[in-house]
Curated annotation (Swiss-Prot):
Top class in the EC scheme: transferase
EC assignment: 2.7.7.7
Keywords on record: DNA replication, DNA-directed DNA polymerase, Nucleotidyltransferase, Transferase
Protein name: DNA polymerase III subunit delta'
Species whose genome carries this gene: Yersinia pestis
Catalytically driven reaction(s): DNA(n) + a 2'-deoxyribonucleoside 5'-triphosphate = DNA(n+1) + diphosphate
Gene giving rise to this polypeptide: holB
Role of this protein: DNA polymerase III is a complex, multichain enzyme responsible for most of the replicative synthesis in bacteria. This DNA polymerase also exhibits 3' to 5' exonuclease activity.
Length: 340
């Protein structure tokens, strides 16, 4: 697994707590997606299970380290949903607990990693609580979570909370620039900055967004919006939005609306879409502040419905949203869309 320079400090702090006897058996790691959190948890797991630690590093040579490197350590448990399911049910947790109360096969620590703790059902989380309160000897739980507020409060209270902050912008841009130079792919600095801001400062998420195929989709959407505004035909965006990635594409549009609001308030230097400033200015000039605010709220609500409502009619939802947007921009008035 790759390692990233911004993880050095949090890794040393977490390992330092364990090496001095202050480490908690249950870690709740809160991070934005694409910040390297899986690499940090993997490195901490290796250190906890290493049989010949070298200070804050795992040795890489002992039998436990070799098993971890091979990806088949019998005392390292990765708890994820079963194939075809989106949540971790109570039966999976019970099976795990039964294994944890048996002797470690390698005679050392046992480590459980939950890559997305928020997908635990309430019943599964409750089943895990008792074990978190009284864990088997030398057993560690590493919970990775992007939305800790969605976890049961009782589960959060049993864990040591750690927020993995995104690195400074300068560090992120330096790292991104290095990645694209290695691949000999030219990427404009303004594009890297925009991708980083669209990813809320998470460098790995920004790197994925900058992949030529994905970045070209965003560029095409921005071009399509510009043409749609010129023709007063927002519905023409429907083919570009009606896609499995609709939620992300709506987020891109929302960021443009919010940038237009910033521009109207004289705060254009804080715009997210630094590579699309002419489009931001166009939006700022054709719509009043109240209209932009309402459209941004409607887009956020539309996105929430796409992500949370099972079986929602995506095409109908997007069509109503675009027609409402078209009316608002042409008349300066807006309506409140009904909830589907």
């Amino acid at each position: 697994m790759n390692w990233y320079p911004w993880l050095n400090a949090p890794y040393r702090q977490l390992v330092g707590q364990h090496s001095t006897g202050r480490g908690h058996h249950a870690l709740l790691l809160h991070s934005l997606p694409g910040n390297g959190e899986d690499a940090l948890i993997y490195a901490l797991s290796r250190w906890l299970m290493c049989q010949q630690r070298q200070g804050e590093k795992s040795c890489g040579e002992c039998h436990s380290c070799r098993l971890m490197l091979a990806g088949n350590h019998p005392d390292w448990y990765v708890l994820t949903p079963e194939k075809g399911k989106s949540s971790i049910g109570v039966e999976l947790v019970r099976q795990l607990i039964d294994k944890l109360y048996s002797h470690a096969q390698q005679g050392g620590a046992k480590v459980v990693w939950l890559p997305h703790a928020e997908v635990l059902t309430d019943a599964a989380a409750n089943a895990l609580l008792k074990t978190l309160e009284e864990p088997p000897e030398k057993t560690y739980f590493l919970l990775d979570c992007h939305q800790p507020a969605s976890l049961l409060a009782t589960l959060r209270s049993r864990c040591f909370y750690w927020y993995l902050a995104c690195p400074d912008t300068a560090i992120c841009l330096q790292w991104l620039n290095l990645q694209w130079r290695k691949r000999q792919i030219p990427v404009e600095p303004v594009a890297m900055l925009a991708a980083l801001k669209l990813s809320e400062g998470a460098p790995l998420a920004a790197e994925r967004l900058l992949q030529p195929e994905r970045w070209s989709i965003r560029s095409a959407l921005c071009s399509g919006l510009r043409e749609a505004l010129n023709r007063s035909d927002l519905l023409s965006l429907l083919p570009q939005l009606n896609h499995d990635d609709a939620a992300e594409r709506l987020q891109w549009l929302s960021s443009l609306l919010l940038d237009a609001l910033k521009w109207q308030q004289g705060a254009g230097e804080f715009a997210v879409n630094q590579d699309q400033l002419p489009l931001v200015q166009q939006l700022a000039h054709i719509a009043a502040t109240p209209v932009l605010l309402q459209l941004a709220k409607q887009l956020a609500h539309c996105r929430h419905q796409l992500l949370s409502v099972v079986g929602v009619n995506r095409e109908l939802l997007l069509t109503e949203q675009l027609l409402s947007w078209e009316t608002a921009l042409s008349t300066g008035t807006y309506s409140t869309l009904p909830s589907l």
